[in-house]
């Protein structure tokens, strides 16, 4: 489900540790390393966010979503759809179509985990510090190879070591954004949050790939 991939791609950019082989701005690297260490130290994380999308560099549509994560497991809910990764399989649940698709994660799906996805930036992106905007430090990520993305801007609260906003601009001038409206950490989250209960979807078409 491409929508979920794009959403998590930009949702979790704060958890990153970059390697010296890239063109790395020292100030940007230090900010990202501190943010990375902060997120990785948490047992669980909860984000409520506004996902924006549009074209020609302007956001024209917004949707609210929530995201739970515990180490390499997560649950995403947005637009009446749900995606669960239990550490082994990815479950895509489409309420409107009453369909569930179950699959082993491929390379891109495995990287949907906040930590695992962002570790890909070790080899795929150059980073630079662009300044302070609205009291947030802004880091620019530019892909080292063509991947459809022109650049990504991370807006980071340096004091809290947290991402507050992410802007992704594509080569075709499409724009997607994530604005974090609520963040909680180390919550007591029931383990069932990250598991798929087949009994709850008896009337759904369930396909395992």
What are the roles of these predicted feature ranges?
Residues 105-134:
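Flexible, surface-exposed loop/linker segments and immediately adjacent secondary-structure boundaries
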Residues 1-8:
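Bacterial N-terminal signal peptides that target proteins for export
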Residues 2, 18-59, 72, 146, ...:
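N-terminal leader/targeting segments and the immediate start of mature chains
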Residues 134-209:
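Gly/Pro-enriched, hydrophobic low-complexity segments
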Residues 64-111, 171, 176:
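An acidic-aromatic
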Residues 51-53, 95-96, 167-170:
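Beta-turn initiation residues at beta-strand->coil junctions
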Residues 9-16:
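Bacterial N-terminal signal peptides
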């Amino acid at each position: 489900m491409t929508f979920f991939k794009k959403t998590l791609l930009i949702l979790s950019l704060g958890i990153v540790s970059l390697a010296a082989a890239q063109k790395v701005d020292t100030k940007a690297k230090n900010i990202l390393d501190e943010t990375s260490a902060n997120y990785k130290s948490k047992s669980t994380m909860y984000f409520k966010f506004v996902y924006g999308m549009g074209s020609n560099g302007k956001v024209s549509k917004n949707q609210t979503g929530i995201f739970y994560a515990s180490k390499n497991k997560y649950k995403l809910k947005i637009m009446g759809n749900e995606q669960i990764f239990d550490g082994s399989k990815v479950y895509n649940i489409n309420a409107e179509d009453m369909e569930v698709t179950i699959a082993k994660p491929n390379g891109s799906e495995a990287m949907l985990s906040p930590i695992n996805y962002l570790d890909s930036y070790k080899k795929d992106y150059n980073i630079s510090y662009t300044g302070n905007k609205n009291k947030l430090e802004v880091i620019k990520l530019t892909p080292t190879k063509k991947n459809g993305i022109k650049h990504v801007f991370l807006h980071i609260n340096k004091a809290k070591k947290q991402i507050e906003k992410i802007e992704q601009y594509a080569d075709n001038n499409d724009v997607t954004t994530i604005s974090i409206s609520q963040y909680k950490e180390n919550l007591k989250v029931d383990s069932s949050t990250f598991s798929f209960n087949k009994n709850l979807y008896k009337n759904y078409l369930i396909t395992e790939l």
